[in-house]
Amino acid sequence: PSNYIRNEIRLFAIENNLEYLNQRNHEGLLRTLMIRTASTGEIMVLIQFFEENKVQRELIMNHLAETFPEITSLQYVINSKANDTLYDQDIKLYKGRDYILEEMEGLKFSINAKSFYQTNSDQAYELYKITREFAGLTGNEVVYDLYTGTGTIAQFVSKKAKKVVGVEAVPEAI
């Protein structure tokens, strides 16, 4: 579904003269697009606008909400900074929830726009299984998951460890 959404945004932007950000002269509206699709089928779409233009913003957000009712979380942010980082930005919920649910081995994870999470859910699952296997846990260890993000790795190894401690510096990433 992410390619359909991405392509629709591109087509809609062209048809409605919505300009993409030009990094050199700092002009334009559309900055970046983040689409997350969980293995549960839930979809998060976050559009980063360079400047506030309520008419154009609502035009594209309404179009997405109507064209793709399957979007679980539709969000946007106005970011006029020199970089694209989101952690210090105020993300606005346009429609749905401000998170999507990911599920692996019966464990459920809430993923929000600022969560650190692997971009490929299927490969993340394989990576976590290998991580758990390589750890060779016997059930007596205390495991520290530094920069834990959503805590997926910590939770994966928790079944085979005495105790797991997740440490994260960015509260919104949890």
Identify the role of each PLM range:
Residues 1-19:
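Extended interfacial segments that mediate partner engagement and assembly in macromolecular machines
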Residues 27-39:
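Core structural elements
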Residues 56-58, 62-174:
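Rossmann-like S-adenosyl-L-methionine
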Residues 7, 11, 28, 125-129, ...:
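Short, contiguous clusters of charged residues that form electrostatic/catalytic patches at enzyme active sites
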Residues 20-27, 143:
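Short helix/loop segment immediately N-terminal to the Walker
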Residues 35, 41-50, 108-112:
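Short, aliphatic-rich beta-strand segments
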